[in-house]
Regions:
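A short, basic N-terminal segment
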Residues: 1-58, 82-85, 426-427
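Mid-core helix/loop region of P-loop NTP-binding domains shared across ATPases and GTPases
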Residues: 2-19, 28, 59, 103-113, ...
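Walker A/P-loop nucleotide-binding motif
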Residues: 57-80
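Conserved catalytic segments around the Walker B and adjacent sensor/switch elements
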Residues: 61-63, 86-102
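Post-Walker A helix-loop "phosphate-sensing" segment adjacent to the P-loop in P-loop NTPases
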Residues: 81-93, 120-123
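AAA+ ATPase "lid" subdomain C-terminal helix
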Residues: 261-267, 275-288, 328-330, 348-349, ...
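Conserved C-terminal helix/linker of AAA+ ATPases
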Residues: 280-302
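Terminal-proximal interaction/regulatory segments of ATP-powered molecular machines
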Residues: 328-427
Length: 427
């Protein structure tokens, strides 16, 4: 607690003695625990596959699958850290290069980032660092590839390149990067490179050329979802480090685990629930974290994630959703695709958008259904044929909040008379 609490003004009451947390950082996804409960089998498999790198051999490439929060990245980082530590003791240098393809999602950026990390991260290697400066833009890809290979050869070691969220890279930029990296060893004499791809999406393999898939998936590992008892063990481990003694009601951790187990066994969701429950109790100046705090945390997470989902929708998807909101505001609780399409065609020009075809509007409606924002069903209307009925599955307030958070304010600036004209022609 600050010595002069009276000088902290607005924040004073929040900086007083913390009754709840001992170290809340251990409850975040970014924290790396020393042990990973219920992932020994996968860790042992990874170690067995990568062990040849310690004997001047090239390990197999690996594809790792599993839903969000199943310990894929944490396990790979753990094994990679152990591999580097053992290699230093054995003086058989190995380096693990971790690339987040959700951010670094083009071939140029991936190759550039690898080259940069090769230059920056070799303080402990006996050779001089290969200080080759590479701009983030401006060079041809083959030039970047050549410079990267220079650094591999300069260092002369075993390298494991981890492409986390590899599906994001493939879906945005195709499989050229993977084709290049899986064939890199034919251009190297003094170094060896292996690839680990991590994905939440089994379907991304359909985007790969068969030759790339064959090279990349020499070994495949699947990380199953955690069940509720396993999530309890994970939360108990973190809670012991993260919370003060006796502040958690005994039902809090089992409830967090049970709720997260329903979300495909997501350890990240379980940790978020536990941490946010503690934060809510802390803000209330409560002495204990209770199941009421867990339920409030669950509502908060679902609210925040849905608003963010809607806020980041493409503008045309927002426009279709906006048309549903207008219909709902004027009394319709269930919509049919024809009404939505007619209102959309009237409003799109006023929203400064190109008017999409009925088929494309229907596709966007299906995407909104997949995101859990709306529900849909096909109904038979007799001689009028079949049509799609829709209704909101998410909170109307959350949807409006996400729609209104548009950088161009197009959905708040549209004149009411234009909306009324669209409704008159659209119903």
């Amino acid at each position: 607690m600050p010595e002069n609490i009276e000088q902290t003004g607005l924040f004073g009451k929040y900086l007083s003695i913390n009754k709840i947390f001992k170290d809340r950082e251990v409850l975040r996804h970014s924290y790396r625990p020393h042990t990973l409960p219920h992932r020994k089998e996968q860790i042992d498999q990874l170690a067995a596959i990568l062990a040849p790198s310690l004997q001047s051999e090239t390990p197999s490439n690996i594809l790792i699958y599993g839903k969000t929060g199943t310990g894929k990245t944490a396990s790979v980082r753990y094994v990679g850290s152990e591999l580097e530590a053992v290699s230093r003791k054995m003086k058989s240098y190995c380096q693990v290069i971790h690339i987040n393809c959700d951010i670094i999602d083009t071939q140029y950026r991936v190759l550039t980032q690898i080259a940069k990390l090769l230059s920056d991260d070799n303080d402990e290697h006996p050779s001089d660092k290969a200080r080759i400066q590479i701009p983030m833009t401006g060079l041809a890809t083959d030039q970047i590839y050549s410079k990267m290979n220079e650094q591999f050869e300069h260092i002369g070691a075993a390298f494991i390149i981890v492409l986390d969220e590899i599906d994001k890279l493939v879906k945005k930029s195709g499989d050229d990067t993977l084709y290049t990296l899986t064939r890199i060893n034919s251009d190297l004499t003094h170094s060896r490179v292996s690839i680990i791809g991590i994905s939440n999406d089994l379907g991304f393999k359909t985007f790969l050329d068969p030759r790339v898939l064959s090279s990349l998936s020499e070994e495949e590992l699947v990380f199953p979802p955690y069940n509720a008892p396993q999530l309890c063990d994970i939360l108990e481990q973190r809670a012991e480090m993260g919370f003060n003694q006796h502040v958690l009601d005994e039902e809090v951790i089992p409830l967090c685990a049970a709720l997260a187990a329903q979300e495909h066994g997501d350890a990240r969701r379980a940790l978020d629930l536990l941490r946010i429950s503690g934060e809510l109790a802390d803000r209330e100046r409560a002495d204990k974290v209770t199941t009421d705090h867990v339920h409030k945390a669950q509502d908060k997470i679902e609210t925040d994630s849905m608003t963010e989902c809607i806020r980041t929708l493409p503008t045309q998807s927002k426009a279709v959703l906006f048309c549903m909101l207008i219909l709902h505001k004027h009394g319709q609780k269930v919509f049919i695709s024809g009404d939505i399409t007619r209102v959309y065609r009237s409003l799109a020009p006023a929203l400064h958008l190109d008017v999409l075809t009925s088929r494309r509007v229907s596709d966007l409606i299906s995407e909104l259904n997949m995101l859990g924002i709306i529900n849909t069903r096909l109904v038979n209307r007799g001689r009028h044929g079949r049509t799609k009925e829709m209704w909101f599955d998410a909170s109307i307030d959350r949807i409006w909040e996400g729609i209104h958070d548009d950088p161009n304010e197009r959905f708040t600036a549209i004149p009411s008379e234009i909306v009324q004209d669209a409704l008159t022609g659209g119903i």
